[in-house]
């Protein structure tokens, strides 16, 4: 079991390091892999608050979705453009977040939220990577 956890941790570290260099690249073939499932979700952005629901200070690279707290969210545009990998460590009070049909991405300020919404047009494809627990 310990080996599986170590391998999983290595995979997560690799994904996070790749996300910094691969942002904006297109991978439409990723949607063709039958072993990987994606959810098409509404996507919003927020820039308020200081501490997440899990006690983590807010920072770019986190997102909120009540059903997936503790998981990683790999976000793509519908054309396969890679947006990044986000740690889901926050929740929200909106019905969409509670039902898990929205992913809310933290941005450092209002201008970054507006940029995010223009980029995504309010829709993303999400691959969830289960976290521990």
Place the predicted regions along the sequence by residue.
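Solvent-exposed, well-ordered loop and adjacent helix/strand elements within mature globular domains
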Residues: 23-133
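Positively charged n-region of N-terminal signal peptides that target proteins for export
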Residues: 1-4
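Bacterial N-terminal signal peptides
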Residues: 8-16
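Generic short amphipathic/hydrophobic targeting helices enriched at N-termini
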Residues: 6-9, 32
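Sec/Tat signal peptide C-region and signal peptidase I cleavage site
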Residues: 18-21
